Regions:
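Often metal-dependent polyanion-binding catalytic scaffolds in large enzymes
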Residues: 1-215, 232-234, 258, 295, ...
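Generic recognition of flexible, low-complexity loop/linker segments
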Residues: 3-6, 14, 160-161, 245-250, ...
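Catalytic or ion-translocation cores adjacent to nucleophile or general acid/base/metal-coordination motifs
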Residues: 27-58, 281-476
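Short, glycine/acidic-rich hinge or "gate" loops at secondary-structure transitions
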Residues: 61-69, 155-158, 288-291, 384-388, ...
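Acidic, glycine-enriched catalytic cores built around paired aspartates
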Residues: 87-90, 97, 171, 176-178, ...
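Active-site cores of enzymes that catalyze phosphoryl transfer or operate on phosphate-rich substrates
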Residues: 97, 110, 174-175, 180-272, ...
């Protein structure tokens, strides 16, 4: 089995750089088209490089090795496909047939490499169209080497290239397309208006009215408008993107495109709207049974309320005739093989944390995944969870093996999708050894957890009523802080959020719509600003109050479960790590920037009281202090403390000066010193090894 590539664990890469337009006006249809082309070109660059390296190793001579008929046949077949292009290759390396064969394969790769220039896609007679063609030609090479006894060459040199073709295909990474449900609603409203159907009040329609209209529309393949017609800015934006996807599928197949992800999925109609928009752009097919969508439609549940509603929304979605047809169509993998019927569901860790606090967020995610997995089993559909984790504890980060162990029972069935943030990519995959380690950790962890889940019986989590009460009390404490009058003033003055809003380090604007409200602020700058000021509020606040709300007997039960329930261990260990990363001296130094002393004292008392309570309750629960139990972690933090303190104090000095210039109306001077301020932010982020 180990020599059969199809039996090895499968790993695939995805991206939404160039595909994620949720709140990012710069990601246009043209950007998506260019992204798909660049991904395809770079896949060919990677594969060509591997083929060139392979050809250099295959110096077997036909005078020393018998030439198998299988290689002669394979070489003739490739040469015939290339036509005249094969002539130059066949005139070289005439006594090294294996090398010559690989040179023919290189000629079939449709990429033009020009030194010191961007590689260009090229088309020509005999060029590869699909990755399976290259994989098949490489399999012929491997088999011919095995035939002449060169098994080691086949295993050590050819198999890794076959594996690269399996992993990267001709697309390098699948591009996901993400857009907000509100944007889709506006697009549909404009389409309806343009078609004379009066969609101006679409967002005011009751849900049952929406569903009646959408289900009726999806029984017909007829679009609203001619392809050349314009319906409005949102409609044109969505349809422009979808038409790029449809054109790419028509030319190259769907391997390079992931899913249509709908952020802020709040109701069933948010998903069905996407089917109607896909029909308008030619992203559907009309089969005898009815319309099918050529790409998966994936809900993204982000807030605590949305996670609560997720099972009922997904259950209704899976009952929709178009959903069932589309899932069955996609399960045939474009005619290659029959795969299990699978519905992908994305769960977000950031917004639920920002709205409700760390414990309520984690418990809400745990419950939602368990219920969604059970719903899938009842419907005969495999649920593939896509975990939108960030680079910090408050946004779902943590040790990979602990994260996998903490997943709800029976929620992992052999495959999983995870996001990796920009700052963690360099840390985890910047070097060959660490990249290998982290990928192996993920593959082994998924395999082990899947086996564990298959052996276990689905059951309610232990202590569910106790954790429900803990979660509710922690959420109330967290919301009390955020809802306290003048909190936004304290937050904006005690953290560098205003400087972060002027930076260009994120992939999207810091606010969804530009409104200066807490609700409109994205989770990443929210977390980043608290980390920079060493409060780490999103990573621990509310946990102490939640634990304090329990009885002594309930606390003792939680203490016992810590040893046997990975979820509880994972969450409380991460909260403890956040508490350890705070710095009281620096918290006070940042708070000193708050102009109103009474306001400063009021909020610092709330935060420090909860900080002390959380430490106290964690020590009580664990039966020992952090210094006794986790000396290595504290030693690691201490090693960086002095250097970081200098950087923090410099940042505070620069922030005060920058804010003073802006307050005085000297925008030119403020703009001139912004690079120094952003440099200090970057230095602190590097020292802490995290942003948001």
């Amino acid at each position: 089995h180990m020599r059969d590539e199809s039996k090895l664990p499968q790993v695939r890469f995805g991206t939404w750089v160039g595909g994620d337009r949720d709140g990012h006006p710069g990601v246009t249809a043209e950007v998506t088209a260019e992204t798909l082309e660049r991904l395809r070109a770079n896949a060919f660059v990677v594969l060509r490089k591997q083929l060139v390296a392979l050809s250099e190793k295959l110096s077997l001579s036909q005078w020393m090795q018998p030439l198998p008929q299988s290689l002669i046949t394979a070489r003739e077949k490739v040469a015939e496909a290339l036509g005249e292009r094969a002539r130059a290759v066949l005139s070289t390396n005439t006594s090294e047939p294996w090398r010559q064969y690989v040179e023919l394969l290189i000629e079939r790769v449709p990429i033009e490499i020009v030194p010191h220039q961007v590689s260009q896609l090229r088309t020509g007679i005999g060029s590869y169209e699909i990755a399976e063609e290259l994989a098949k030609d490489l399999a012929s090479l491997r088999d011919s080497l095995t035939e002449v006894g060169a098994q080691r060459l086949a295993d050590s040199d050819v198999r890794p290239v076959i594996r690269a073709v399996q992993v990267f295909g001709f697309h390098l990474a699948q591009l996901d397309i993400r857009q907000n449900s509100v944007f889709h609603a506006k697009a549909l409203s404009q389409l309806m208006d343009a078609a004379g159907l009066d969609g101006s009040q679409w967002e005011e329609w009751a849900e049952n009215e929406r569903l009646r209209f959408l289900e009726k529309e999806l029984r017909s393949p007829r679009p609203f408008l001619h392809a050349s017609a314009s319906a409005g800015p949102e409609a044109d934006t969505v349809l422009g993107c979808y038409r790029v996807l449809a054109a790419h599928i028509a030319r190259h197949g769907a391997d390079g495109i992931g899913a249509l992800i709908i952020s802020m999925t709040r109701r069933l109609s948010d998903l069905l709207v996407v089917y109607v928009l896909a029909r308008e752009a030619g992203l559907t097919r009309s089969l005898p049974e009815g319309l099918v969508c050529m790409l998966p439609v994936v809900p993204l549940f982000e807030t605590l309320d949305d996670l609560e509603a997720a099972p009922s929304i997904l259950g209704a979605f899976l009952e929709e005739p178009m959903t069932r047809r589309s899932l069955d169509f996609l399960s045939w993998n474009w005619g290659r093989e029959k795969l299990p019927i699978t519905q992908q569901v994305m769960v977000g860790y950031s917004d639920s944390n920002k709205d409700s606090g760390i414990f309520a967020s984690q418990w809400g995610l745990q419950k939602a995944q368990a219920r969604l997995a059970q719903l899938g089993r009842n419907a005969g559909v495999r649920i593939r969870f896509f975990h939108g984790r960030g680079g910090t504890v408050s946004r779902g980060a943590g040790p990979t093996h602990r994260f996998l162990e903490a997943l709800p029972n029976n929620s992992l069935s052999g495959d999983i999708r995870l996001t990796e943030q920009g700052e963690t990519i360099a840390q985890k995959f910047g070097h060959f050894v660490t990249a290998t380690y982290n990928l192996e950790l993920l593959l082994a962890g998924v395999a082990a957890t899947t086996i564990e889940h298959e052996r276990s019986v689905p059951m309610a989590p232990p202590l569910a009523p106790v954790l429900e009460r803990l979660s509710r009390a922690s959420q109330q404490a967290y919301r009390r802080l955020l809802d306290t009058e003048d909190f936004i003033t304290f937050y904006r003055q005690a953290t560098p959020i205003d400087a972060l809003e002027h930076s260009r380090i994120g992939s999207r604007p810091s606010r969804r719509t530009g409104k200066p409200s807490l609700a409109d602020l994205r989770a990443i700058p929210w977390v980043f600003s608290w980390i920079q000021s060493r409060f780490y509020v999103p990573g621990w606040f509310g946990a102490g109050s939640g634990l304090k709300a329990l009885t002594e007997a309930e606390l003792a039960e939680i203490g016992d479960q810590l040893r046997t329930w990975p979820f509880l261990y994972y969450v409380l260990t991460n909260i403890e790590a956040s508490i350890a990363s705070t710095d009281l001296e620096l918290m006070n130094a940042y708070a000193d920037m708050v102009e109103d002393p009474a306001l400063r004292e009021r909020f610092m008392k709330i935060i420090l009281d909860e900080w002390n309570l959380t430490r106290e309750m964690l020590e009580k629960l664990r039966g020992a202090s952090m210094a006794e139990r986790r000396p290595r972690m504290l030693r690691t933090l201490k090693l960086r403390a002095d250097a970081l303190r200098v950087l923090h104090l410099q940042e505070i000095h620069l922030l005060k000066k920058w804010r003073g210039l802006r307050k005085a109306g000297d925008e030119a001077a403020a703009e001139a010193m912004l690079p120094d301020l952003l440099l200090s932010i970057n230095a602190i982020a590097s020292g802490l090894r995290t942003t948001g």
